[in-house]
């Protein structure tokens, strides 16, 4: 989220109005405006023929899964293709059962199978870790020479190196061999990419830019479908089903975004709050990264509205509000009473009433299911968030320079991922999510703190030098007497450790179900996509626009070219 602060001007003077003292920043207008209002029911209708064809092809894929032996290389290759093509959610139980058998046989002698092949060894390891199995990394020791380095003979096996690279991104803290594997595979892939055939070099480049472990399912599927189609050994059944499923789900998402856009247009924030980012489509894309599956439609609607309101609040606290106004807004949100809105200036009242309206909508729907308690947690996390915003605003206006420890204590909250992670569970009605799960996620467990570290540090690294607010880069440089480059190098190391922490938290025994952990993991993946090298949320007219087009505008045709 953007962080813009006042310059050295005092907070107020006798002869200067609040309007003259307001901070300001210029954001580009919405890229999409009312584009998605055109996706009406007749446009996004899924025909009976499409539904029938989907079920027909789905049954064929299931038969293929059932008929392929679990102890074969073909089975793990099939599972990998299904997951990367984006329709693994249809076959979660079958895949889980199959990989369970693979895990049971993991350390058994392989006979004449190609167990020692680097590609297969790495693929099996990755799939099992993705599934949460705590498989040991010593399986890669056989690939080392007498000096403890990876054998030179592996360098020419590009497919093997690529598989090793993907597997090494599932390492956890303390696994030195996985660090070696990542360095070895990535360096040799980068060094030889210009010598590879075009189709292979594209696969390698995509992987180096965004490994599977950090890839958003829908965006990754769109890209992989194109790559998979170019592979001469591709399975035509899988390719056909992937395209059909992608297009059908895209229609569902377009219909959802139509209703979200209509809600947003009704609020008229673009006119009434012109200082704020108008990014509701980008917010929907963000939440699509958290959960894309059709069954999470209600959860997606809830969380999209909450993150959209959070973006507006963020701009009020960081860009526009005076200190007195911000104190009043914070007090009002702590009170959580619609009548308190009368005490706010008009522009804040608009936002405050819309915020309470979103939570009232959620509460009404969850009350019908006897799950109103979930809103107590969600509201409290929003209150905690704005209190952190307020602390940072006080620092900004008083020109207080916090220590790195002081800053991170607030910044891990103000990054909003603690609030969003908790709120992501509210609408997940199909799962047996309990009060215990909400108690766990609001206790700031390691998984959530790691995601918050990734969110905060990646945001701050791209924001330094642009934002006028003191952020982590400034704090670290001041405390350690170092350059921005040295600070960012340290932060990247912290981000890498946080990813490894998240990898480990997803392994059995887990503190929560994978369905819950996946929301936190996916939130980190979105940040990793949008905040590498730039703030592609605040400036969403290029890279982010293309991402959105690929998953929410352009259907997949019979001939699909690279995105």
Swiss-Prot record:
Residues 44-71 form a coiled coil. Mn(2+) 1 binds at residues 314, 318. A motif (DDXXD motif) lies at residues 314-318. Gene3D superfamilies: Farnesyl Diphosphate Synthase, Terpene synthase, N-terminal domain. It comes from the Eukaryota. It is an enzyme of class 4 (lyase). Binds 3 Mg(2+) or Mn(2+) ions per subunit. InterPro entries: Isoprenoid_synthase_dom_sf (IPR008949), Terpene_cyclase-like_1_C (IPR034741), Terpene_cyclase_plant_C1 (IPR044814), Terpene_synth_N (IPR001906), Terpene_synth_N_sf (IPR036965), Terpene_synthase-like (IPR050148), Terpene_synthase_metal-bd (IPR005630), Terpenoid_cyclase/PrenylTrfase (IPR008930). Pathway: Secondary metabolite biosynthesis; terpenoid biosynthesis. One of its GO terms (molecular function) is terpene synthase activity. Residues 320-326, 392-429 are annotated as: Homodimerization. Expressed in peltate glandular trichomes. Present at low levels in flowers, leaves and stems. Belongs to the terpene synthase family. This is (-)-germacrene D synthase. It comes from Origanum vulgare. The gene is TPS3.
């Amino acid at each position: 989220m953007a962080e813009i602060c006042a310059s050295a001007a005092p907070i107020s003077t006798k002869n200067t109005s609040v309007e003259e003292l307001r901070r300001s920043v210029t954001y580009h207008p919405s890229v999409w405006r009312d584009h998605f209002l055109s996706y009406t029911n007749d446009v996004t209708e899924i025909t009976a023929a499409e539904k029938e064809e989907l079920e027909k092809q789905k049954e064929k894929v299931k038969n293929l899964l059932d008929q392929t032996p679990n102890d074969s290389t073909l089975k793990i290759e099939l599972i990998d293709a299904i997951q990367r093509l984006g329709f693994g959610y249809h076959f979660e139980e079958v895949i889980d059962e199959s990989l369970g058998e693979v895990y049971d046989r993991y350390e058994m002698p392989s006979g004449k199978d190609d167990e020692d092949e680097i590609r297969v060894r790495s693929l099996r390891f990755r799939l099992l870790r993705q599934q949460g199995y705590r498989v040991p990394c010593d399986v890669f020791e056989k690939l080392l020479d007498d000096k403890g380095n990876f054998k030179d003979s592996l360098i020419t096996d590009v497919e093997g190196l690529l598989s090793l690279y993907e597997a090494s991104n599932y390492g956890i803290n303390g696994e030195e061999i996985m660090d070696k594997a990542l360095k070895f595979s990535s360096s040799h892939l980068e060094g030889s990419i210009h010598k590879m055939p075009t189709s292979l070099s594209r696969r390698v480049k995509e992987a180096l830019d965004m490994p599977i472990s950090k890839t958003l399912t829908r965006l990754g599927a769109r890209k992989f479908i194109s790559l998979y189609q170019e592979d001469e050994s591709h399975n035509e059944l899988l390719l056909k089903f992937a395209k059909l499923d992608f297009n059908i789900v895209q229609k569902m998402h377009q219909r959802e975004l139509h209703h979200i856009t209509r809600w947003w247009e009704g609020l008229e924030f673009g006119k009434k709050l012109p200082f704020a980012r108008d990014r509701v489509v980008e917010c929907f894309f963000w939440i699509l990264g958290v959960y894309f599956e059709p069954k999470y439609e209600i959860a997606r609607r809830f969380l999209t509205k909450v993150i959209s309101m959070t973006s507006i609040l963020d701009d009020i606290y960081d860009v526009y509000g005076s200190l007195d106004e911000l104190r009043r807004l914070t007090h009002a949100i702590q009170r959580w009473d619609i009548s308190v809105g009368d005490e706010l200036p008009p522009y804040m009242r608009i936002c405050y009433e819309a915020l309470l309206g979103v939570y009232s909508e959620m509460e009404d729907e969850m009350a019908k299911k006897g799950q109103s308690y979930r809103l107590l947690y969600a509201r409290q996390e929003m209150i905690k968030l704005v209190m952190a915003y307020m602390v940072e605003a006080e620092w900004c206006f008083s020109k207080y320079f916090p220590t790195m420890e002081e800053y991170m204590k607030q910044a891990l909250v103000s990054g909003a991922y603690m609030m969003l992670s908790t709120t992501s569970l509210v609408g997940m009605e199909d799962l047996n999510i309990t009060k215990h799960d909400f108690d766990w996620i609001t206790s700031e467990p390691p998984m959530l703190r790691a995601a918050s570290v990734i969110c905060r540090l990646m945001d701050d690294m791209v924001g330094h030098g642009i934002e006028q607010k003191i952020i982590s880069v400034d704090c670290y440089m001041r405390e350690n007497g170092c350059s921005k480059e040295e600070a960012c190098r340290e932060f990247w190391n912290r981000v890498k450790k946080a990813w490894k922490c998240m990898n480990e938290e997803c392994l059995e025994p887990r503190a929560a179900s994978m369905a819950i952990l996946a929301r936190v993991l996916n939130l980190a993946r979105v940040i990793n996509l949008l905040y590498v090298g730039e703030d592609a949320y605040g400036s969403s007219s290029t890279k982010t626009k293309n991402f959105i087009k690929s998953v929410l505008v352009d259907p997949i045709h019979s001939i699909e070219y690279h995105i």
